Regions:
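Conserved active-site regions of diverse hydrolases
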Residues: 1-315
Length: 315
C-alpha cells in the first residue's frame, strides 16, 4: 500500500519485484487490487495543502488525511465487493492481505516547499517540522490500529538541489554541489525528527516492523558525485525551458510556449538516462531507479535489512 506525494517509489518497487503496477485508488475502472493499492498523489502534503509554486497556484487536494480516508474506504469496500464472489473475488485483496502488506510512505517534501513559497523564513519553515512529523505519526498509528504491521518510511530528499527551489530562491547560499544550503538543512532537520518519530513508533508498537530509509543521502550523492554514478548536469532540468537551470514556472514540461513569436512545446533533453532532474521538481526515471536499487539493499535503512525482509518479517 503506497502513501506518497509522488508514486515513483511505489511504481519502482513493483517493477523491481516483477509485480504488476499498483492500481491507483481513484483509477478503479478495470483495476485489480490483489497486489495492493496506490494512494499517492503528485504535490501531496502531510498537512492541509496550500499552493506550493505560487506562479501556478497549484496544489494537490489529496493530502495525507485524504489518502488515509481513501485507504479506509478501500479496506472496507474491497471486502464487501470481494464477498460477491466470481470475478470480484479475483480483483480485490483478501482480508488478511492488509495485515501482510508493506505500507510505504514517501511524503513531507511538499510541506517544506509550501512553507518556502509562503514568504516564511528558513527558521519559520523549520519551526513547522515538529507538527508536520507529529501529524504523520498519527496516520501511521491509525493504520497500525486497523491491522498494518510492516512500514517502509522514506526520509525526504535534498529539496535545495531541485531547480524549482534554486530558481525560486536565486540568492540562497550554495554548498559545494551547488544546492541551496539552508533549504537542505531544513530537509535534514525534517529527517532527524522523522527518524525520532520512527524510533518512538517502534517503542509504542513492538509487534510491528518500522523501517526508516535514508533516501536523502542517496539522492544527494547524485548531485555531489554525478560522474561517479554515470550522471551529468544534475542541477539542470531535463524537460524544461529558460534560465540558469533550464526551468521556469511559466514553461513547464509538456507545455506549449511562445519564443520569439514561434510556438514550441517544452520537451525532453536528448538523453534523460544520464540526467537527474526531470522537470525541476521531480527526478528522472534513471535517477529514481538508481535510488531504489541502492535503498532496496538495506544499506541505507534502519534497521539495515533489505526490502524483501521488510515485506515479510512480520507475516
Amino acid at each position: 500500500m503506497g502513501f506518497a506525494s509522488i508514486n515513483v517509489s511505489v511504481i519502482t518497487l513493483a517493477k523491481s519485484f516483477n509485480l504488476p503496477y499498483l492500481s491507483a485508488y481513484l483509477n478503479s475502472l478495470g483495476a485489480s487490487y490483489t497486489n495492493g493499492a496506490n494512494f499517492a498523489s503528485a504535490g501531496a502534503t502531510i498537512r492541509f495543502p496550500s499552493p506550493i509554486i505560487p506562479a501556478s497556484g497549484g496544489y494537490s487536494p489529496f493530502y495525507l488525511d485524504v489518502q488515509y480516508q481513501q485507504f479506509m474506504q478501500f479496506k472496507d469496500r474491497s471486502q464487501i465487493i470481494r464477498k460477491q464472489g466470481g470475478k470480484f473475488a479475483k480483483l480485490m485483496p483478501k482480508e488478511d492481505y492488509f495485515r501482510k502488506a508493506l505500507y510505504t510512505f514517501d511524503i513531507g517534501h511538499n510541506d517544506l516547499g509550501a512553507g518556502f513559497f509562503s514568504n516564511m523564513s528558513i527558521e519559520e519553515v523549520k519551526a513547522t517540522v515538529p507538527d508536520i512529523v507529529n501529524r504523520f505519526s498519527i496516520y501511521v498509528k491509525n493504520i497500525y490500529e486497523v491491522g498494518g504491521r510492516s512500514f517502509w518510511i522514506h526520509s525526504t530528499g535534498p529539496i535545495g538541489c531541485l531547480a524549482y527551489i534554486l530558481t525560486g530562491f536565486p540568492s540562497a547560499e550554495k554548498d559545494s554541489a551547488g544546492c541551496a544550503k539552508q533549504h537542505n538543512e531544513v530537509a535534514r532537520y525534517f529527517n532527524y525528527k522523522l527518524k525520532e518519530a520512527v524510533f518512538q513508533l517502534r517503542k509504542d508498537f513492538p509487534s510491528a516492523a518500522f523501517t526508516y530509509v535514508d533516501v536523502y543521502s542517496v539522492k544527494y550523492s547524485l548531485f555531489s558525485e554525478p560522474k561517479k554514478y554515470g550522471f551529468e548536469l544534475p542541477l539542470i532540468t531535463c524537460c524544461g525551458y529558460g534560465g540558469k537551470y533550464n526551468y521556469s514556472d511559466a514553461a513547464g514540461c509538456g507545455e506549449t510556449i511562445t519564443v520569439n513569436n514561434t510556438k514550441m512545446v517544452v520537451g525532453s533533453c536528448d538523453n534523460p538516462s544520464v540526467r537527474v532532474d526531470w522537470d525541476g521538481a521531480h527526478y528522472t526515471e534513471a535517477a529514481n531507479k538508481f535510488v531504489f536499487d541502492r535503498i532496496s539493499t538495506g544499506a541505507f535503512s534502519d534497521p539495515p535489512i533489505p526490502l524483501n525482509m521488510a515485506c515479510h518479517r512480520n507475516v
